[in-house]
Amino acid sequence: MSPKMQALLLLLGLITLLVVHAEEELSENTESERGCIKLNQECVQNKTPCCNNRPCLCYMRFNICLCEKPLGEIFGR
C-alpha cells in the first residue's frame, strides 16, 4: 500500500474517532440539560428522573438509590 493511501486511511480513522467522541459528549450534555440522572448515578425516587426512563432502584442495605438498567436492557432485549 502506498504511503499516501496509508496517510489517507489514518486521517479517515482519526476523523471517525473524533466524530464518535463528539457525539458521546453531545448526548451527555443533552441529558444534563433535560435534568435527568445518568446510569449508575445516585437518584431520589419521585424527584429528578433517570435518563432513558431507567428505574431508580434503592438498596436499603447500603442506604443508596441508583439509576439502573432495566432487565430487558441487561439481557439485550
From Swiss-Prot:
SUPFAM superfamilies per record: omega toxin-like (SSF57059)
Disulfide bonds: 36-51, 43-56, 50-67, 58-65
Main localization, broad class: secreted
Domain of life, source organism: Eukaryota
Stretch forming the signal peptide: 1-22
Propiece span(s): 23-34
A single cellular component GO annotation: extracellular region
Keywords recorded for this protein, A-Z: Disulfide bond, Knottin, Secreted, Signal, Toxin
Protein localization: Secreted
Tissue distribution of the protein: Expressed by the venom gland.
GO MF annotation terms: ion channel inhibitor activity; toxin activity
Entry's family note: Belongs to the neurotoxin 02 (plectoxin) family.
Domain comment as written in the entry: The presence of a 'disulfide through disulfide knot' structurally defines this protein as a knottin.
Protein name: U18-lycotoxin-Ls1a
Organism: Lycosa singoriensis
